[in-house]
Structure formats: structure tokens, C-alpha cells
């Protein structure tokens, strides 16, 4: 039968997310912990917290929505970005570090600088975000 190697997947997720984020940050001339926001694939809280601890990221800079939505697969980072945008916490000039992993043991990360202002009427659900 088919079996998932849970510990192997956990180790891959934590190590690849951390390495990918560090490589992207290094290319940008910064450390991951300097990003205003770090958005990870919302697989489970244990992975998210392990990556956060490994990189020394302030929990207040790593929002999560897995408590509300569960693991939404490849949509988790875009949905988390949507929630952050609509919370009113994301502001022009902020740097975001994004990381995801998934099928076939693939992973990737990038850094972006946000420049879109948040209209006041969209600032409606900051309370839906928790922090790792």
C-alpha cells in the first residue's frame, strides 16, 4: 500500500523552507528575520513554528490562517497574502518572504516588496490571523 513517510516529509519541509528563504534573502542582501512578513505554506503549525525558530523570525511577523482554513495545498500562500492584505497590516514598502513546498518534494521561496496601498474599507479582518 501507499504510505506517507511523515518524519521525512517534516524534515524536508523545515529544511527546504529555511534554506530556500535564506538563499532568497541572501540574494537580496538581507536576513529572513529582517523581512516585515514571512508567509509559509500552511501545512501544519509544527512545521511553521519549526521554520520560524530555525530562522529566528519574530512570531508577530509570521501570520497563519491554518486554524481557520486548514491546509489549502497550493493556495495556502496566496490565501494567507489575501488575509494579510485585508487585515490592513500589510503596508506599502513592506518586504515579504514567501515560501512553499509540495508535491514531488519540491520547494521554493521569493522576496517581494509590497507597493499596493490598502483601501480603508478592506481593513476588516485582522482578527482572523494568528501568529506562529
Question: For the regions a protein language model found, what residue spans apply to each?
Answer:
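Short active-site-adjacent structural elements
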Residues: 47-49, 74, 105-107
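Active-site-adjacent helical/loop segments in soluble small-molecule enzymes
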Residues: 65-77
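Buried hydrophobic packing segments
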Residues: 20-21, 51, 77-84
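Hydrophobic pocket-lining "lid/loop/helix" segments that shape and contact the acyl-thioester
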Residues: 1-67, 118-132
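Generic structural "secondary-structure junction" signal
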Residues: 4-6, 11-12, 68-71, 92, ...
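A short linear-motif detector with a strong N-terminal bias
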Residues: 16-19, 75-78, 89-92
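Conserved beta-strand-centric core segments of catalytic alpha/beta enzyme folds
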Residues: 81-132
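Hydrophobic alpha-helical segments
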Residues: 54, 58, 69, 83-87, ...
